[in-house]
Amino acid sequence: MASKRGAPSSAPASVATSPTPAPPGTLHATLTELPKGQVLHRVHQDKYRANQFNPGVRGNARFSPIQDDHGQPIPTLYAGTTMDCAVMETVFHDVPHTAGFKTFDKGKLAGQVHSTVAVARPLRVVDLASVPLRKLGITRKQLLDTEKDQYPATRKWAEALHRQYSDAQGLSWVSRQDDSARAFMFFGDRIPDGVLKPQGASRSLVEDGNAYDAVLDLAERIGVLIVPAR
């Protein structure tokens, strides 16, 4: 029987609004090359070196911690193509999308540093931009724009990509927090020593004047007022 004109549609909700699905048995990924000489930015705790991988034992990020086929943790390292991206993906990650100025405790910047590393040789990474995601069979909203409750599911995709593409050395996507830049996550078991070369000393986000000025500039652009540590 034909539906009545104007009747509400009974079609299922769009796949774009569904939770992150499990990765299929066979993935169709697109690999791209990160060129030699590319400089990447990182924000991390000052107790770690600029090119030091997270051992992957604990944490709760979109693509880490993850394990290989033998249940062993895969070391990971996150980076971005700009300092803005690195700051937005770390210390400003949870700033709410509310109008007007928001306050941010300066104490949250303590112990955080900005580092840069240069890629010493080309690296092959899985491209998670919108076009290759269509071939992969998942939407950006399901994989990259989810909230934290979906992180266990998004990590399954990182594990599956690592398992099925033995030449993949990491993942690359348009940053959710700063869509003018690219974010990266590298697989530590596939990045030889010396490939990520630190460029100069790491800079404290609080104690280094130039680094703090850059943080203040970004804070103003996202409507954040940095207040003294409580």
List each language-model region with its residue ranges.
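Active-site and NAD+-binding cores of ADP-ribose-processing enzymes
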Residues: A2-P65, H97-R230
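Extended catalytic/binding region for NAD+/ADP-ribose chemistry, centered on the ART fold
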Residues: P65-T98
